[in-house]
């Protein structure tokens, strides 16, 4: 077992950092700060950060095949032009639910942008329940709705053979799997593959490694856990020096580094003193596993 090293590479003080995505072309980590309405890009070589502020909470960001990025902003799927800091609306959802916003999102292996919604929180993880839905933005900009009655739509990824879709609705305290049809994007046969332990708290963002194992960030649990989706067993726990770990992705030149986002909102003054790096970006090396490059949106 290689020795694991955890370092805070950027003290960004995110209110709620989320959606880390490695951009290979720019050697950068993209991420968002949801309540600050910001998309950020941290260059791993220069250590510089560029920030784009949008007009609504921005909850996820993804690469785009045609260049630039796509993001979920409020209840809209948007194309993001980094150079002029502009966002163009591609589609909108939940028009009848004024209190909703998007949460986590990710692009599937066929280039569809999956993202789910939730009600705005009155405090971290406190909200009107069952208000969210899971959607996907297809390459032709049409949107499909998969299901509703979601509390906090969160982590998502696909198995290495593209036959299983993994999904987290945070307040179910479960990691779920669906059968997945790559050609159509259809999902079916939902089942739970892992129930969170009490000390792991709330399942949040998620990614997959090249061995087909899942990594889940545990909000309020201060850790990422590695799961075997076939056996339902937890294989590994990596604890971080912050409680509110929100999401994770692999990056770096060979995708052997893990990047973890976290939040400072919800910490009291004592918590902030004890966790000065809360809201920062963490890099974990020495895990001994690698991840996959993120898929770009095809539209």
From Swiss-Prot:
Location of the active site: 204
Gene Ontology CC terms: cytoplasm
Annotated positions of the N6-succinyllysine modification: 244, 253
Pathway: Cofactor biosynthesis; L-ascorbate biosynthesis via UDP-alpha-D-glucuronate pathway; L-ascorbate from UDP-alpha-D-glucuronate: step 3/4
Keyword DNA-binding: no
Keywords: Ascorbate biosynthesis, Calcium, Cytoplasm, Hydrolase, Metal-binding
The reaction(s) this protein catalyses: D-glucono-1,5-lactone + H2O = D-gluconate + H(+)
Cofactors, names only: Zn(2+); Mn(2+); Ca(2+); Mg(2+)
Enzyme class: hydrolase
Binding site for substrate: 101, 103, 121
Pfam family, one: SGL
UniProt GO molecular function: calcium ion binding; enzyme regulator activity; gluconolactonase activity; zinc ion binding
Main subcellular location: cytoplasm
Gene Ontology BP, a term: L-ascorbic acid biosynthetic process
EC identifiers of the protein: 3.1.1.17
Localization of this protein: Cytoplasm
Cofactor note text: Binds 1 divalent metal cation per subunit. Most active with Zn(2+) and Mn(2+) ions. The physiological cofactor is most likely Ca(2+) or Mg(2+).
Membrane spanning residue stretches: none
Binding residue positions for a divalent metal cation: 18, 154, 204
Family indicated by similarity: Belongs to the SMP-30/CGR1 family.
Subunit structure and binding partners: Monomer.
Physiological role: Gluconolactonase with low activity towards other sugar lactones, including gulonolactone and galactonolactone. Catalyzes a key step in ascorbic acid (vitamin C) biosynthesis. Can also hydrolyze diisopropyl phosphorofluoridate and phenylacetate (in vitro). Calcium-binding protein. Modulates Ca(2+) signaling, and Ca(2+)-dependent cellular processes and enzyme activities.
Name by which UniProt lists this protein: Regucalcin
Lineage summary: Eukaryota, Metazoa, Chordata, Craniata, Vertebrata
């Amino acid at each position: 077992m290689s020795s694991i090293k955890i370092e805070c590479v950027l003290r960004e003080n995110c209110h709620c950092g989320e959606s880390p995505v490695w951009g290979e072309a720019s050697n950068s980590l993209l991420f968002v700060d949801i309540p600050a309405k910001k998309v950020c890009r941290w260059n791993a070589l220069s250590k510089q950060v560029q920030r784009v502020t949008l007009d609504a909470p921005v909850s996820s960001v993804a690469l785009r095949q045609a260049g630039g990025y796509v993001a979920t902003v409020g209840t809209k799927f948007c194309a993001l032009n980094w150079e002029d800091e502009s966002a163009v609306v591609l589609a909108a959802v939940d028009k009848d639910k004024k209190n909703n916003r998007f949460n986590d999102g990710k692009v599937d292996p066929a280039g569809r942008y999956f993202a789910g919604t939730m009600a705005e929180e009155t405090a971290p993880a406190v909200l009107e329940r069952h208000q969210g839905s899971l959607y996907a933005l297809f390459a032709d900009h049409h949107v499909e709705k998969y299901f509703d009655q979601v509390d906090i739509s969160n982590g998502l990824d696909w198995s290495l053979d593209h036959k299983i879709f993994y999904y987290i609705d945070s307040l179910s305290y479960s990691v779920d799997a669906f059968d997945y049809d790559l050609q159509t994007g259809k999902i079916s046969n939902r089942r739970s593959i892992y129930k969170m332990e009490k000390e792991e708290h709330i399942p949040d963002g998620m990614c997959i490694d090249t061995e087909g194992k899942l990594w889940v960030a545990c909000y309020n649990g201060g850790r990422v856990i590695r799961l075997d989706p076939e056996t339902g067993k937890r294989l590994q726990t990596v604890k971080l020096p912050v409680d509110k770990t929100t999401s994770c992705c692999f990056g770096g030149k060979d995708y052997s580094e893990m990047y973890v986002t976290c939040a400072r909102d919800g910490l009291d003054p004592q918590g902030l003193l004890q966790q000065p790096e809360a809201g920062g970006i963490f890099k974990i090396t020495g895990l001994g596993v690698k991840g996959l490059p993120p898929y770009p949106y095809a539209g």
